[in-house]
Design a protein with these regions (language model features):
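Hydrophobic core of transmembrane alpha-helices in multi-pass small-molecule transporters
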Residues: 26, 112-128, 322-337
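A late C-terminal transmembrane helix in Major Facilitator Superfamily
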Residues: 352-383
């Protein structure tokens, strides 16, 4: 009688551990969303005599510096976490994130260039959080509930972005009470920085006290073979394309508001809130229905691409603001449907390569955002609202690849299915 040796079961995450992991994603997203709207007025005080166009240029460059930090750091931190342990890299990333925020309170150390360095540094340390959290969740989650947990992580990021303006409101209220002659915008910005740092420090402490220190059992050679890089190249290209579309689409909304008097600032803000809420609803749908476990990922990606195409078409041809809202909803729903599929399929990587896989996806997303902002700004300057139609090109490319190269997506999906669930 032949005996069989059962593979050791991977320890599942406890609810408190999962909470702190999702909260870490929430905090870094909220910190970015809270500080970004305050940068123009804050920089005006840091650069005496600057013109509005100069301030706007620096705001764009600072956002680019942050994104560049994520782009460079994500694959590096992912690779290091696979070797040294994901828990310690995650905590180290939060320590660096909190430190880079607090140092913003001392811009006199080097003026404007110090702010540039600190924003790039913040992006570099956030890059240690973005890929490592999903890698930890994938490594310690049975496949049967993995899709739901990744939907939860996506929701945490979106909620963090929505929470950013709320953090600003709290800061404004506190600044009004404690101003004592200090300019309100300067004090409000400092309070946002301190609150963001406190939230980051709280998550850092919670993760240090609750996360597992071991990385789980070693994998068999079959699982390692199932994580061949070629299959995940398709996911990286998909991440670049979808993030390019999403970034260009969001920038197009902002520029549309600036060039058309009938579209108020409040309406533009409402469209951004609509975008986040629709994507949050899509994540809730994936969470409660476990759709990714029941339907071919290839079909989900195709459906999301078609929805986004419809939304961009409406935005390119709209005649009234009401049609703009419809276009925003459709585009948000489509991109919001595709993005969780990418992370879910990437979770099928070998446990030993989860960090570098998720890091590659984070870098691909940052590259797509950078390309989308650049292309979106140039296109809108050239053809205005028809830029939305040109942004549909990457989505057409996705649909063509889904038809002409179905083996890419079947191979990637099979790798996710082969990842250990017990």
């Amino acid at each position: 009688m032949r005996s069989t040796i059962k593979k050791p079961r991977e320890a599942d995450l406890r609810p408190l551990q999962l909470f702190f992991l999702a909260a870490a994603v929430f905090v870094v997203s909220a910190g970015y969303g809270a500080l970004l709207p305050l940068l123009p007025a804050w920089l005006s005080r840091q650069i005496p005599g600057s013109t509005p166009s100069e301030v706007a240029r620096h705001v764009g460059f600072l956002s680019g510096a942050y994104t560049a930090g994520v782009l460079i750091g994500a694959p590096i931190w992912g690779m290091i976490s696979d070797r040294l342990g994901r828990t310690r890299i995650l905590i180290f990333g939060l320590v660096g994130y909190v430190t880079s925020l607090l140092l913003l309170l001392l811009p006199s150390m080097g003026g404007l260039w110090t702010i540039y360095v600190l924003r790039a540094t913040a992006g570099l340390f956030v890059a240690a959080v973005v890929p490592v959290v999903p890698a930890l969740v994938a490594a310690h989650t049975p496949k049967a509930i993995r899709a739901r947990r990744f939907a939860w992580l996506g929701a945490a990021s979106l909620l963090g972005f929505l929470f950013g303006p709320g953090l600003n409101a709290v800061a404004d209220a506190l600044a009004a009470v404690f101003s004592n002659g200090v300019t309100l915008i300067a004090l409000s910005t400092r309070i946002v920085i301190v609150l963001s740092a406190l939230l980051g420090a709280s998550m850092m402490l919670g993760l240090a006290l609750t996360l597992p220190t071991h990385e789980g059992a070693a994998e068999s050679d079959d699982n390692l073979a199932a994580s061949a890089p070629a299959g995940f190249a398709a996911l990286w290209w998909l991440s670049i394309a979808v993030n390019l579309v999403l970034s260009g689409f969001e920038l197009g909304i902002v520029l549309q508001g600036r060039q058309h008097a009938e579209l108020s600032t409040q309406q533009v803000a409402l469209m951004f809130a609509e975008c986040s809420l629709v994507m949050l609803a899509i994540n809730a749908l994936l969470f409660f229905t476990a759709l990714l476990d029941k339907v071919s990922p290839r079909l989900v990606v195709a459906a999301g691409s078609l929805l986004a195409l419809a939304g961009l078409s409406v935005l390119a041809l709209h005649q009234t603001n009401e049609w703009m809202y419809i276009g925003v909803s459709l585009t948000s729903a489509g991109t919001g449907l595709v993005l969780p599929v990418i992370s879910f399929l990437a979770a099928g990587a070998s446990h030993r390569a989860l960090g570098v896989t998720m890091g590659g996806l984070a870098a691909a997303g940052a590259l797509g955002q950078t390309l989308g902002s650049t292309a979106g700004g140039w296109l809108f300057g050239a053809v205005e609202r028809l830029s939305f139609a040109w942004l549909a090109a990457p989505l057409f490319a996705i649909l063509i690849l889904l038809v002409l190269r179905p083996s890419w997506w079947r191979a990637t999906a099979s790798r996710a299915a082969l990842s250990p669930s017990h």
